[in-house]
């Protein structure tokens, strides 16, 4: 953050002129490029092509065209290929939007740092990941009785997103540019289709739309916490995880009133009070309570009226269901979590009398939803809808090494993400699909059959599918196969997973 502040020399006047660095400062686009590379490396995802945007020639040409005001006026009837630019119009729109997101984020980030008042901010790679949510479930939810899945609705009009920023952005031209981005190259229908509402996070303009989404949701969560404070007479403390869009800034403790005064960069948040727990990641939140459903109903209608009356977002109370935690499994972050009761009999003896006691222990069980996962693989053309492997025809032009590396990386990432599941047998079906899909892709490239190809090269060709967890545990326990097998079947939560995998995100 000091680097941003040193380069840009931010002060309060930037609130009135946000377009200046976007048009006159070339290193803004370097920040965008570096952020994209770091995000791809840290999250073990494939590179999405940020190297193609780092060309100084392209950036200079883009900025020189922006000096001419008429080139920023783009009609919806124009062709996607701009003959003046020489590149696809959406390519330049994406570059400008990501640079715009960097410029607008900086005042929020500086405000967050100043709000910590001397508290040391630890770098993101030393902090918790989204896997830390599940130990929170395991610790708190066995003592709760009711749970509710809440899908946060999107605004039905683009102007609502712009109005959220108007409270602090005084630069009218920046708001007009924001409207241009929203109407130009983004399909608003995605906001209206529930099962695609989170798909914006995996698109090419991730930083830009994640910024808009966080500004909208955190505004609603601030009001939600105000209502929560009014319902409690105790001054409780709450711990929150602060993100820079994807990464944690730190896990700090503050009074609730102070935390949510500067809560803009929050992407993952959880708070607790005497009777209710709240967890959110991106567009889905979980409400859980120990008491009777009356309290849950109260909070449900709070949410609905808040969305409808304050944010002009249509929602119905009937779409939010309250379920018993002991009888209902809820999906969150790609896992299917449910309550499991372990029964045991304890023999106790007191003086000359002995008796048996039945002991029931509640435990949160995290499972892998195999059907949605196979559906995601089918959508990516690795298999059909019933799980039969297919060749990946779009990768057939790559080298053998690149084909194997891509398939193996996807397999390792899935095993890495689902390491916290108590039952990993279903993952071996996914491994089988990816391995056979890889072989079929290689056989298609070499114009051969699968059997002939394997007979010629041998099974050692697919050693890359040996998962990371298996490698690590085999090094620690090289001679005790039973111990290795027991540990690998256990739950392992990692601290280096900063965003949900596209194949895992079934929402």
Curated annotation (Swiss-Prot):
Keyword Repeat: no
Entry GO terms, CC: chloroplast
Pfam families associated with the record: Intron_maturas2, MatK_N
Keyword tRNA processing set for record: yes
InterPro entries to which the protein is assigned, alphabetical: Domain_X, Maturase_MatK, Maturase_MatK_N
Compartment(s) where it occurs, according to its Swiss-Prot or TrEMBL record: Plastid, Chloroplast
Assigned keywords, A-Z: Chloroplast, mRNA processing, Plastid, RNA-binding, tRNA processing
GO MF annotations in UniProt: RNA binding
A single BP term in Gene Ontology: mRNA processing
Functional summary from the UniProt entry: Usually encoded in the trnK tRNA gene intron. Probably assists in splicing its own and other chloroplast group II introns.
Similarity remark: Belongs to the intron maturase 2 family. MatK subfamily.
Protein name: Maturase K
Record organism: Humulus lupulus (European hop)
